[in-house]
Structure formats: structure tokens, C-alpha cells
Amino acid sequence: MTLRIFDTGTRTLRDFKPVQPGHASVYLCGATPQSSPHIGHVRSAVAFDILRRWLMAKGLDVAFVRNVTDIDDKILTKASENGRPWWEWVSTYEREFTWTYNTLGVLPPSTEPRATGHVTQMIKYMQRLIDNGFAYAVDGSVYFDVAAWSKAEGSDYGSLSGNRVEDMEQGEPDNFGKRGPQDFALWKAAKPGEPSWPTPWGDGRPGWHLECSAMATYYLGEQFDIHCGGLDLQFPHHENEIAQAHAAGDKFANYWMHNHWVTMAGEKMSKSLGNVLAVPEMLKQVRPVELRYYLGSAHYRSVLEYSESALSEAAVGYRRIESFLERVGDVEVGEWTPGFEVAMDEDIAVPKALAEIHNAVREGNAALDKGDREAAEKLASSVRAMTGVLGFDPVEWGSDAGADGKADKALDVLISSELERRATARAEKNWAVADEVRDRLADAGIEVVDTADGATWKLQ
């Protein structure tokens, strides 16, 4: 089957045809390590980790680049406010992001370039834009000339976001000498006390948009397959990346993919609103694999509304899968179901893929109850294949757990097995058995909590 991707640039589902057959090249806008990561940040990493895993599962050799924006206005401001060197501030939070990615099972990128390590590439990029007539230098800063580019043959400025040029204003704070309000900084002239690098136009530091265009094309070439990022980056960041690249003569990305926000009480999760949830705090409620399951469970283009009940229900869903595989015992990874492949090939439709997994779990448990171990093992092998693609194969996660984690896991599996028995009894209206399971767990200090999506448990 052919993978189809919703391309933000054309607002259509398109067949994925890689630039180089047998290979896939992907660029993901990564972290700006100005503060601790929250689940809004991490959703993007998990969503496109699933994309990457599916491309790999289809036999493609994937070059996956995820950058680090290690210099920008917010970093400098926060470091200064806290009396710390900017590079030390960045290093602290970059380590937190790396820990978070690793903890949630996000595969390491093929390359993780930092902006400050690619000033040479940025200088060359600016020179090309100036030579082509689409950038200009003023008092040590370099700006992209939006008016000149928007009038040029082949210009598509505004097409990604749907904005009109006349309605755009970049809001650059350092706008002295700009020819137009839409123009944005490629390079910012040095200020006292700030880090700077030498260029032919004066010392300074890179603009945000220039960094990604220069690094993406340096590592993936002037034309590559997929550019990913959060929906909030669509404008101005990604719109300006496209403008720079096309004005420089590069074809740039063939497909654009954007994940939607994590919201709380209907509002986008953001530091400015004070409604962010740091990953370590979340991990006090659920295990890392359960948080990954939750973050990846919604379609990447859908809003993920956070609530404690939604997180608990996701954990219950994962534990059902885990409990089934524990019942079956050791099985090798098999083949995914045809329905799973259809779901993943249709714009990475994880909710439909999860439905395939849970159908297989239900059928497998039924087979075990009937004594058909061969059928159960075949289904378990399929479940392992499907959960592996999504990055939460319970067997793989279990093998990576420490002693404490294994003890917790064993306890959880035992209780989940009892909850499955109770659920079966309730479905058969065998209330005596259902009550017996509940009471026995209560005697052990475990409270059963019934939710719309099944039962979970907590210590009394």
C-alpha cells in the first residue's frame, strides 16, 4: 500500500513519493531549551517519532534531523534574568529535553544540529539571498525583503499559512532600517553583552528562521521529503523558512506536516498562560510508556485535550495490552494486521491503528479463555508488531525496566488480570464473581475505579 500524508502546503492528502527511492528525509523543528519541557513540546516529538517508525517499518532508510535552537531572544532574556551565562542555561535545559525524549522512547535523531554550530552555513545562505536581490544589510543586521520576494516570479509567500502579505507584520523588535513591516531578520546586529559571531556585514547572531533553512538543506539537501513541526510554527516560522529557501533557489520540503496542540480546559497549553504540565510531574501519575501511549493516541492533526481522567483512561488502555501479552508469555514479533497497515498509511491514523490492536487483544483473551493457545500466540505476535511501530511494545519496555520498575509492572499486571476477570464477569452478569474480585482487591489495599473506558486501580 501507499502511504498518504496530509500536506499542509496543499491542504490535501498526497501519496508519499520520496525524492530518493528507498530513502526518506525528514526535518523536525526541535527544542528551544529556554525552560523545562512540557507535554505540549513532547507531543510533537512523539507524533513524528511514530511517523519515523512507520517509514522505517515500510523498509525506508530514514535520515531524521531534529535541530536545537540554542540561541534566541528568550534564551538570552531568561539567562540574564537568572544571572547565568546563556550557554550554561541552554545546556541545562537541553539535557532535560534529551532525558525526556529518551524516557518516552523517542528514537535519537540521525543528526541533532545546534544553530550556533552552523554560522558558516548561515552566512553562505544570506549571501545567496543578497546576490539574488531578496535580502539586504543595514547597520550589521540582514533582513529578508518580503516585498521583493512576493513580487518575484514563482513566489508563493503566504501559501502555507493562508495569510496575505499585506496582513503580515513580523513584529521584529529590532526593526531599525527595515524597508517594510513584513521584513524579518536573517541576522541580528550585535548588542553589548550578547554573544555574537563575525560576518561580512558585521558581528551579530542568527535569526530564528534562517537557522532551520540553513541546517535543513545542509544535512538533507536542497530538496528533501518532509518538514515537521507544531501547528504554532506554521506562521511565521515555517512560512519564512519556505520564503528563504525558495528565494535562495532551493526546492526545500516536498511535504509539510503539523501536529495540533495539547489543550487544557479548551486553552492551548503554554507557559504564558501558566497551564503547562512538566513531564516529571506527569510521571508521578503514570509510567513513561503510559504517557507515551497517551500522547500518541490521538490523531496528530487533532487537538489533544488534557484531563486527569483522559490520562487515566489511556493508562488503562495500555495495561489491557500489557496484561494480554503477560497472559500469553514469550512470543516473537509477528506481522501487523491489514487494518493496521491501512490505518497507518492513511496519514498515520493512530486512533484506527489502536482499534486494531485492541481488537486483537480482545480476540486473544477470548482465545485463551477457550484454551486456543495457538490462536492467542499468533494474535500476541501481531500485537507486538503493531505496538512496536507505535513505540510502546510492552515486551520491549519491560526488558528495559529496572528492579523497581519490574516489581511495579508485575503488580500492575497481576491487578490488571484480576480486573479483566471482573470485567468478564460483569459482562456475563455474574455479579458474585465481580464482587468477589473487587472485595479481594480491597482487602489488599487496592481500590477499583470504574471509568467510561473500563476499570483501573489505585492504592487506598
Swiss-Prot record:
Record keywords: Aminoacyl-tRNA synthetase, ATP-binding, Cytoplasm, Ligase, Metal-binding, Nucleotide-binding, Protein biosynthesis, Zinc
SUPFAM superfamilies: Anticodon-binding domain of a subclass of class I aminoacyl-tRNA synthetases (SSF47323), Nucleotidylyl transferase (SSF52374)
GO MF annotations, alphabetized: ATP binding; cysteine-tRNA ligase activity; zinc ion binding
Coiled coil: none
Motif residue range(s): 'KMSKS' region: 268-272
Location(s) in or outside the cell: Cytoplasm
Binding site for Zn(2+): C29, C212, H237, E241
Binding site for ATP: K271
UniProt-listed Enzyme Commission number(s): 6.1.1.16
Span of the annotated motif 'HIGH' region: 31-41
InterPro entries given in the database record: Cys-tRNA-ligase (IPR015803), Cys-tRNA-synt_Ia_DALR (IPR015273), Cys-tRNA/MSH_ligase (IPR024909), Rossmann-like_a/b/a_fold (IPR014729), tRNA-synt_1_cat_dom (IPR032678), tRNAsynth_Ia_anticodon-bd (IPR009080)
Co-factor binding comment: Binds 1 zinc ion per subunit.
Main location: cytoplasm
UniProt cofactor(s): Zn(2+)
Superkingdom of origin organism: Bacteria
A cellular component term, taken from the record's GO annotations: cytosol
UniProt subunit comment: Monomer.
Protein name (record): Cysteine--tRNA ligase
Organism, scientific name: Corynebacterium glutamicum (strain ATCC 13032 / DSM 20300 / JCM 1318 / BCRC 11384 / CCUG 27702 / LMG 3730 / NBRC 12168 / NCIMB 10025 / NRRL B-2784 / 534)
